[in-house]
Amino acid sequence: MAKIKPQALLQQSKKKKGPSRISITNIVIYTLAVLLLVFVLFSAYRRWTHRSEIPTHNGRSVLEDAAFPGMKNVDLPRFATLDTGKGSVTIELFKDTAPNVVDQFMKFCQDGYFKGFLFSRVVKHFVIQAGDSAEFDAVKDWALDRKNIDTSLKHEEFMVGTPKAKNEQGGFEFFIVSAQIKDLNEKLTVFGRVSKGQDVVQEIEEVETDDQYQPKSPIEIMSVTLLQDM
C-alpha cells in the first residue's frame, strides 16, 4: 500500500474543513424564491379578506356583470334588495330586456354607491324617486296630471326605471312607479319591478312632503344586496 505524503494529507484536511462557497447566482435564486413565496401568500391573504367582506345569502356569494366577467347568465344576480328606513324592498332585475342599465345598476351596487342614498321626491300613490337631480320634470308632470291618467292602459304597477336622459354627473337615479302611467316608457328605461315590499313603497309614499315633493323627514337606503334568487 502506497504511503501518502504529509503534504498531501494536509491539503486533504484543509479541503474537508474549509467552508463551502455559495455562488452569487444561488443567492439570487434563493432570494427570488422567498420573494415569490411572500407575494403568493400576500395575494392569497388579500383575496381571502376581500371574500370575507362580500355579503352572502344561504351560504352563497351575492356580489352585487360587466361586474361579473366570465360568469354565466344563470349565475348572475336577478334580484336587488333595498334595505331602507321603512323596510326592505326587493326588485326583480330585467337583465334580458335592459341589459346595459342592469349592468350599470349592479356596478353601482358593487361600489356601494347607493349606501346613504335618499328618496328625494315622493308623489303619493304615484312614484318615489331615489337620488337627486335638477331635472325632475317627469315627477312634476305626473303629479300635476294625476287626474287625467288613462287607467284603461294596462301598464304594470311597481315598475322600476331610470331616466332616459343621460346623467351629466355620471351618477344613477331610479324611480319606483306605483301607478299606471301612460308615458312611462317615454320617460324611463324600465329595468325591473318590485317583487316584494310593495307595502314598504306605499308607506314611503305616505310621508309628508313640501311643495317640491321632497320628504320633510329623510328616508335613506342603508344598503343594497344583490341575490341570485329570493
From Swiss-Prot:
It is found in: Mitochondrion. Transmembrane segments: none annotated. It is an enzyme of class 5 (isomerase). One of its GO terms (molecular function) is peptidyl-prolyl cis-trans isomerase activity. CDD domains: cyclophilin. The keyword Transit peptide applies. Keywords: Chaperone, Isomerase, Mitochondrion, Rotamase, Transit peptide. One of its GO terms (cellular component) is mitochondrion. It catalyses: [protein]-peptidylproline (omega=180) = [protein]-peptidylproline (omega=0). This is Peptidyl-prolyl cis-trans isomerase CYP21-3, mitochondrial.
